[in-house]
Amino acid sequence: MCFEPIEETTFHSLLFKDAKICHKCFLKFKPKINKFNIGNVKGLYLYNYDEQVQNTLYQFKGCFDYELAGVFFDYFRLYLFLKYFGYVMVPAPSAKEADEERGFNHVVEMFKSLKLKMNCCVHKTTNVKQSDLSAKERENIKNNLKIDDVDFSKKKVLIVDDVYTTGSTVRAMIDLVKSKNPKKIKVLVMSKTKDIHEGV
């Protein structure tokens, strides 16, 4: 981040008046809206999980820099709000101990900037961090998740997460949400690793 004052007379400053970073810094994330599929569920991601995104995300959730909560969505906010208007966001849970240490749930705070309804109904049953698990162990993440007794019938649900790597968390969440009979399910992730094949 350049930390330079944002020019208030530019086109971008007028169109994105609530942006926390300038357009030049935003472009360093190399934004690109890409579609992918998880089974028969449609997903969308905004960035490849490259070094710039990784470092900024670490500064936000690892260094507790709360002011960075909305920077990934600043210039996508209106588009995403209109695209997913009427959906209820269900954020991926993180370890309770990690949330308590940083003072906030990073996924919740990140996606809160979209101004869509949110239901934090999926929880981890253990405090194991996914980053500490092997790829094989991550595939069994569904055994560490549970969903509240919610009724999603006639509702459209948007599952949201920060990074899509193996996809195990998202797939487990899809199964949990499906058990609550939603009208439709879609997935939105901030970033996605390159080594995951589309459609899996």
Say what each PLM segment does.
Residues 1-200:
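Glycine-rich phosphate/pyrophosphate-handling loop used in enzymes and phosphotransfer proteins
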